[in-house]
């Protein structure tokens, strides 16, 4: 199973926030996920990003690929 770390959209119309999740690469964006690692809220100023760094590192070491957006968000800390 090829795993990826990516964002899944939550919230409501015009008020989105995103979860940082580990999922199978073949699933849809908002399909089921294996583990939730954190969240990203772009609506507050400054944008809020919180995630479990240990679990993120674990999944990267196991072989999960990160999406470009998640890589940018997690490198800012």
UniProtKB/Swiss-Prot annotation:
GO cellular component, one term: small ribosomal subunit
Pfam families, sorted: Ribosomal_S16
Entry GO MF terms: structural constituent of ribosome
Keywords on record: Ribonucleoprotein, Ribosomal protein
GO terms classed as biological process: translation
Protein family per UniProt: Belongs to the bacterial ribosomal protein bS16 family.
Protein name: Small ribosomal subunit protein bS16
Organism: Helicobacter hepaticus (strain ATCC 51449 / 3B1)
């Amino acid at each position: 199973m090829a795993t990826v770390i990516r964002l899944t959209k939550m919230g409501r119309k015009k008020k989105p926030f995103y979860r940082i999740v580990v999922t199978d690469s073949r699933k849809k964006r908002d399909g089921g996920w294996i583990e939730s690692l954190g969240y990203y809220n772009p609506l507050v100023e400054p944008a809020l990003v919180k995630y479990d760094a240990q679990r993120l590192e674990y999944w990267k070491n196991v072989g999960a690929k990160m999406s470009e957006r998640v890589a940018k968000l997690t490198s800012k800390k």
